[in-house]
Each structure stands twice: as C-alpha cells, then as structure tokens.
C-alpha cells in the first residue's frame, strides 16, 4: 500500500533531484554530439513525449480503472508535451510549437513538479507517471533550448498570452460539458494538493488571481534568456518596459 504523498517529503525531494540531474546530464551531453546525432536524439525525445501522451489516458482509464472524465489529455502540460514533441520531430520547425511549451511547460510543469497534484507517493503508479511525464516535458524544452539552440522571441510573448487566454474558453466549455470532477486547467477548482492557488479567492473567482499570476510567471520565465535579445546599450529594465509598453 502506498504512503500518502508529503509535499517536500523525502520521496518528493528525491524525485525533484533525480529529474533535475537527468535533464542536466542529457542537455550537457547533447552539446558534445554532432548535428545529425542531436537531431536524432531530439526525435527520440519527441517520440517518447507523444507516445506517452497518447498511451497515458488508456493506462490510467483501462489499466488502473481511473475515471475517464479527469484523465483526458487536456491540461496545459498535456498541450505542452504534444507541441514540444511535434516540434522536436519536425524537419521544418514551427517556432510557436517551441514557444508555447517554453512558457506553458517551464512555468506549468515546474510548478506541477514543485506542488504535485498527488494523493500517494511511490510505489503508486500515478507518482511515477506524474514525475516521468512532467520531467520529460522539461527535458524536451531544455534540449531544444540548450542543445538545438532555439530561443523564445520577445515579439511572440503577447501572441502566447493571447493564445493562452483564448484557450480558456474551450477548456471551460469542455469542463462544463463533461461535468462531474472534470477540472482541466484547474478552471473549476484548485488542485487537491497544496499549491499557490490555495492563496487565491474561492473558485471560480480563483482565476482572477491565477490568470495574471500565470502571465507574471511566464514573463519571469523569459527573463533568463532575455539577455540574448537585448539591443545595444539596453538594460533588462529597458527590455521589460519595451515588452509592457
């Protein structure tokens, strides 16, 4: 019988540490490969991402008798996994297929790993699936960033923000149609585990705080790579003002 999941308990911190080490090692080693081998490695990661996302609902629903209403691949992290998986497989790569997962994945998957929506720890299968799935999303993004040398662009930030906000509508409709415990993008309720959403107003008004917070997190995600986009004699503060204005 699995023990209850403890936020920042021993198993949680070990899973975070191992995930970080694996991603770091693979991205460092990737820089020592030639271009052809890098592309091959990228395709392997892309295939792994897509196969996992396609098979995961069936594993949960038919293998472990989980309710289908809550295990469809409709969360932001699922979208990130599919997009970055396709991006890594593309010969002519679509920049937005990298940039959307860059923000959604780094912001969303990282937050998910730090505050997992889990009830039980290892050896519960959901514990493994959760960390494996979110970990490889970050691996795909950082492999594209650190090995393939793709970058998010400033002019696409607001495009990403608009796409994110517009997607809230169909996701909300899906939640309402499915009913029950359907809670994709956590629009209907906060996660079961502890998270920053616990500090927000009670649902559904929690989204009034979550939406702007998400955009702030997305922008903070961009800051570390912003130095590659600074114009001559421009500071990071100038960059922030240019983005906001």
Label for each model-derived stretch:
Residues 228-235:
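Conserved small/polar residues in nucleotide/adenosyl-binding loops
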Residues 31-42, 90-97, 148-157:
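Membrane-interface helix-boundary motifs at transmembrane edges
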Residues 17-22, 73-83, 101, 131-139:
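Membrane-embedded alpha-helical segments of multi-pass membrane proteins
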Residues 61-68, 92-94, 117-128:
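Membrane-interface helix caps and helix-loop-helix hairpins in membrane proteins
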Residues 84, 137-153:
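Alpha-helical transmembrane segments in multipass membrane proteins, preferentially the mid-helix core
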Residues 49-58, 105-116, 164-173:
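Aromatic-anchored segments of alpha-helical transmembrane domains
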Residues 44-88:
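A glycine-rich, hydrophobic loop/mini-helix early in the fold
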Residues 6-21, 160, 178-218:
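Membrane-interface transmembrane-helix boundary segments in multi-pass integral membrane proteins
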